């Protein structure tokens, strides 16, 4: 299959049968040492003796220790050449890591054969010594919520990190920069990896995922051609003698450094409309003398999923038209026809496609061998340790400034690569692309702008939450700690609900995209890889319901009922076998199509499957993937899913009624009423709602359990769904406050006590250390739901207290806080540890659905801004000591400047709304009209 390394022996000479014996002995030795490879022996004998040779080969195998692994992974495969097509013979030779033949050479001679050594360029001879200079302290900058390492600019649009030589952040503090075409993750050290379209299937450079070393497969070097001294304009890999400044912004990152009289400013960003990444280096010579410098760009090529699986297939060349370095991987699963290119804006350059030449034997990017030579060799081609490296030389007069542009990307073919190079590789094209980035994010993030007495809320809500949701979750589908690339059915549906105010068309697109991943039976792919759609079919019990839920929420907010009539294909694939939890496959598009409305109907009907307590079946997990063994046998039931299904039925009943589908509307209403009754009858534990029942009927989330006595989401959704008995719902949330809110650690646990030593076997959640991630840590997604529930109950004090706990700025605004929290204080983290000695430490960041839900909590639940078709509703839950706050809202091309005047203590209700001086109503509704004017609205609370 190619999953394991292949050693190929081609033999046609019966007299060289000793080669077969030696290779079999070697293969047995490798297996004994744990080195698993496929040994392929091809019988090249086309004479009348080919059967004799075949028998002798098989006889040697059967007489030795390899007999039991013929045609098995890691075993021996014997094939006659005459049975193989020419394409297969070429393929075997191409993918084999080692090729032996029955030539005149012995096996030892073939093993010891060496390629002719390439002549490398001459070593660089310095003409002067580097001047001694004291390290200049970094200039002080105005920053808010500064923790000693980083803080926000006063407008909150950049997070500025300052690092003195040898200093580092407690964990990588990154920026996830993405567009629909390309993305890159850049850390404060300068480490980066880049992908095109799918961060898992088509990585251009290596994803290291090593937060300790923060390794990188991309870097830029500056070299003084007179002294030979070199450094990187980023803190890694070749740290200079003075400090660095890193500025993470919306769609870009900037690195500032000053060394040897040369100040540098490196901008990195991606094009919004093309698969092109930019690294623009601005240099200023303030040394008082003319300077000769070189700049070198380096990229460790992957062109697929993993470097080790693709490096031998990558072929590089110098493009004769542009001088750019091209790379191809004809065996790449998602990139076989693509051309990857690296280019520099200067005409004079040298290149290499050989990583071994660049780094050197036992070398490292901190001290690459290539920077000890005058230039790069120009060597490209096949069979190399592949990379893309470009070096250019420049001269700087006294006080002169220069801008050098490195572009890196992928094209469908060479002609498109030429177009991208011509369009983007010069300073003008790069500048235009950067201005487009600035313009896009300023426009998108400016759709809702709030001014409140809480400056941390302002900073987070006015940019970072939507930026995290759109750049990392929807477009990038990647972060530093996870390079997923796939769409999660439930994941991006939840994310796009947060985009209703800023980019509602993206929410609409996601509804259609997800409906296309639904099978005829109503279930869906749990996740899938674009563009081809390979993914997993599972028994997860909540995925498909998110389609109906998100559709209802989208229509309620936008009034766009036309989306329900969009015609969408189903998928066709085999159904899961009994006892089968999931399978990975590439399902085909069905000939059957239906409206989005019908897709939602099938999803809801598929969810109407109940267990012994007449509650919905858990399957191999509901929202909590880690509880995959609770209902694996098809009998376990989920209480949280019951609340979620109830909410779906209530919402969709109204939608069905508005479409004239009275039959389904009545079915939804009847099922919702019965489900609510069943929950109250069976799921109430005395002080809170249970979480689930195992297949054998054992309750989970009950006071009878030794572990996981209480789980927060069964309580919070009793409120969010409006389905719980009001008195019980309040009692359940009081239990959450008492048992799961850890004020000493400023976190909100998902469940408690964590799974550890009891007989309960809920699934892989128990494999997490107690107090980590879902197993009793703060799982931020669920913690936001708990906060939302308190707000919906009108408990303003509790809701704002928990919001402050959730706000990452509050975890990293002082040195002692960031030392404990460690991760980025400007974006949401998926989880926070709740176990000593790591209590309060952040888990993985960026790639988490917590960002979208946090935005909805901030804007919709707490500040009370909800869009309802062509109206805005103001229904806030704000602290009693607030006098007023403002929301600037853009509706298409029209701005509404809304001031909410709080009437003092217990100002919970809207008493009057005026627009442009005229009273509109007292119900908290603001009519929306796209007249391209600016409207001033005042909302009075009392």
Q: What positions do the PLM features span?
A:
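Aromatic-rich carbohydrate-recognition surfaces in CAZymes
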Residues: 30, 499-507, 511-614, 638-646, ...
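Active-site acid/base region of carbohydrate-active enzymes
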Residues: 449-463, 509, 514-515, 519, ...
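Catalytic cores of carbohydrate-active enzymes
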Residues: 298, 525-526, 644-765, 804, ...
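Surface beta-strand/loop "capping" patches
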Residues: 867-898
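Carbohydrate-binding/catalytic loop surfaces
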Residues: 481-485, 490, 525-542, 570-591, ...
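Aromatic-lined, polymer-binding surfaces characteristic
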Residues: 447-450, 454-457, 468-478, 485-492, ...
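Anionic coordination/interaction segments
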Residues: 1-493, 505-517, 553-558, 658, ...
